[in-house]
């Protein structure tokens, strides 16, 4: 019998890297609203009192970069100097250029179905039946903890909470099945006036206990709440933030491999993003169909080429049919060409700001989470 621990972390919308992701995706959404043919690669850097936006954007749209940036920061909750960052007074700088025409000639085609990939890349998708949303439990519950913190903060139930927060959950497994939660780490930015005793009790009673299933909490579960004892300075004042620096938080919490490409700020012609969504869609439908308990898929692409250069599936000895048979099913059922997967998942819509926090996967509001291929896989 094999026992092991597995840990995943998440961060809140007020974490500096997530501020950057949200700004990049807010700008992407506004561009897509106006121009479905836009090519967007938008990067954001945040530090005390400043936001720097760069990248390559080719579009007929006009967007107010400064207004969108300030509104995004304001919605997160950085509304005055007390929080360490002020949406109204921070500097907003833009160094946006246009996409290279060398890339454009490899991507755009007269026949949309022959649209080439926007870059080379390797992409992974994953699903497991250990939770109802077919996601790994550690990342699922890490997300739920910081999401709960945000809800309590925005409803002013815990008035001393500030936007920046982090969670980390360690699950204990036996023979591949969850048998308990070993360790919970939760750190939240707070007002200076709150005492640590009050903070720790409130976090335990209002955040941790309502979120984590009681069946997995034992007398041996360890809890570390604001373990440094103080978290007043947070957000961009505490650390600089960059788009695309939380790629494991965005995906499967480390339980699946990652190709290295970030998501936020990229339009769907970038397979780093769109093919990762398609790979999750494929893996989730395979698991939902009962063809495997766990499924990881790797896709690869070449710039300017429509068809994937490779498809690999691994089911970790849980597959009900061979991996080769699964690959054949995937090739026959799913259109994994760049234009095909954009159409399949209806990706040319302003849906990306909501993906930028609390994970891109395991959330039913997103089209790559639908289970409409299960019956076809079983035929």
From Swiss-Prot:
Binding site for ATP: 15, 164-166, 230-231, 239, 245-246, 262, 266
BP term (GO), one: S-adenosylmethionine biosynthetic process
Database matches in Pfam families: S-AdoMet_synt_C, S-AdoMet_synt_M, S-AdoMet_synt_N
Entry binding sites for L-methionine: 56, 99, 239, 270
EC number from the UniProt entry: 2.5.1.6
A GO MF label: ATP binding
Keywords on record: ATP-binding, Cytoplasm, Magnesium, Metal-binding, Nucleotide-binding, One-carbon metabolism, Potassium, Transferase
Reaction catalysis annotation: L-methionine + ATP + H2O = S-adenosyl-L-methionine + phosphate + diphosphate
Pathway: Amino-acid biosynthesis; S-adenosyl-L-methionine biosynthesis; S-adenosyl-L-methionine from L-methionine: step 1/1
Chain sites annotated for binding Mg(2+): 17
The keyword Protease belongs to this UniProt entry's keyword annotation: no
Region listing for Flexible loop, in residue ranges: 99-109
Record's subcellular location: Cytoplasm
Highest taxon of the lineage: Bacteria
Subunit structure: Homotetramer; dimer of dimers.
Physiological role: Catalyzes the formation of S-adenosylmethionine (AdoMet) from methionine and ATP. The overall synthetic reaction is composed of two sequential steps, AdoMet formation and the subsequent tripolyphosphate hydrolysis which occurs prior to release of AdoMet from the enzyme.
Family to which the UniProt record says this protein belongs: Belongs to the AdoMet synthase family.
Name of the molecule in the record: S-adenosylmethionine synthase
């Amino acid at each position: 019998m094999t026992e092991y621990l597995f840990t995943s972390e998440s961060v809140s919308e007020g974490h500096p890297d997530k501020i950057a992701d949200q700004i990049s995706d807010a700008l992407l959404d506004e561009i897509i609203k106006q121009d479905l043919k836009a090519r967007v690669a938008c990067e954001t850097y945040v530090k005390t009192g400043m936001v720097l936006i760069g990248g390559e954007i080719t579009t007929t749209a006009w967007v107010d970069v400064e207004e969108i940036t300030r509104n995004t920061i304001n919605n997160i909750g950085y509304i005055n100097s007390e929080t360490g960052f002020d949406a109204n007074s921070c500097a907003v700088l833009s160094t946006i250029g246009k996409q290279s025409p060398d890339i454009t000639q490899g991507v755009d085609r007269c026949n949309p179905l022959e649209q080439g990939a926007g870059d080379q890349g390797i992409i992974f998708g994953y699903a497991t039946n250990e939770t109802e949303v077919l996601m790994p439990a550690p990342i699922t519950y890490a997300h739920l903890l910081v999401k709960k913190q945000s809800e309590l903060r925005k409803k002013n139930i815990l008035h001393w909470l500030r936007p920046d927060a982090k969670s980390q959950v360690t699950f204990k497994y036996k023979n591949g099945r969850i048998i308990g939660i070993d360790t919970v780490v939760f750190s939240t930015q707070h007002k200076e006036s709150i005492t640590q005793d009050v903070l720790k009790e409130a976090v335990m009673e209002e955040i941790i206990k309502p979120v984590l299933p009681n069946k997995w909490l034992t007398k041996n579960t360890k809890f570390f709440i604001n373990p440094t004892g103080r978290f007043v300075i947070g957000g961009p004042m505490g650390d600089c933030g960059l788009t695309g620096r939380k790629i494991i938080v965005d995906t499967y919490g480390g339980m699946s491999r990652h190709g290295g490409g970030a998501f936020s700020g990229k339009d769907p012609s970038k397979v780093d993003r769109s093919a990762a969504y398609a790979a999750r869609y494929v893996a989730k439908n395979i698991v939902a169909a009962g063809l495997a308990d766990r499924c990881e898929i790797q896709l690869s692409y070449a710039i300017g080429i429509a068809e994937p250069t490779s498809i690999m599936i691994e089911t970790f000895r849980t597959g009900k049919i061979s991996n080769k048979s699964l690959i054949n099913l995937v090739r026959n059922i799913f259109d994994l060409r760049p234009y095909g997967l954009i159409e399949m998942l209806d990706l040319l819509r302003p849906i990306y700001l909501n993906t930028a926090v609390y994970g891109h996967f395991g959330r039913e509001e997103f089209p790559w989470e639908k289970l409409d291929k299960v019956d076809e896989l079983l035929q």
